[in-house]
């Protein structure tokens, strides 16, 4: 009340301009996907799914779309910041700490609920804490759920590359190495539990731990292409 009306309007105008600029800059890659101009229906379909899911989708949920994309079409999306990972397709720029904080604020403001949810401490790659139970919120923060564990999605991709590189002789078994534990930032017991949940069989040979891929049988999910009205970023221009 002590601020004069014209000064209040100037302040409101300044704050709105500042916020609009921050949103535009921080979420630039998301807006580029929303406004993508492509005649290719598969590029548009994947862009739509990424936009509707706030920059990250599980690869197996959009597998048909991904498999139909040529290398040139993937390059088009990569140039917009899309990362094609083993487990997820995501906009990697959206998982920087400052961008995660902004997206969470927008998400909470739009939902008007779950205001007591906060992301894990930035810098953590592995979380095993019962206070983190909201799977959708944690994926928004960049973490994938494995039972009671959460692992950062970009770290999952690095782990997958590490597994490939560790299997130089192309055998069906991979030796568990200390650098794999260091990458996730967890102990061996937790790593073994997570790797099993990822579809690997773990076994011991000569006092050493190995694992090999034994994928679970999955039921195919149909893709929902209906426009959602509860996307927290839909109102942003």
Predicted segments with their positions:
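Acidic, serine/threonine- and proline-rich low-complexity intrinsically disordered segments
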Residues: 1-176, 183-188, 193, 201-202, ...
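Short, charged/polar, Gly/Pro-enriched secondary-structure boundary elements
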Residues: 216-222
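Short linear clamp-binding motif
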Residues: 223-237
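Short, surface-exposed, charge-dense and proline/glycine-enriched linear segments
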Residues: 203-208, 232-236
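Short, flexible active-site recognition loops that position polar ligands and cofactors
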Residues: 181-185, 223-226
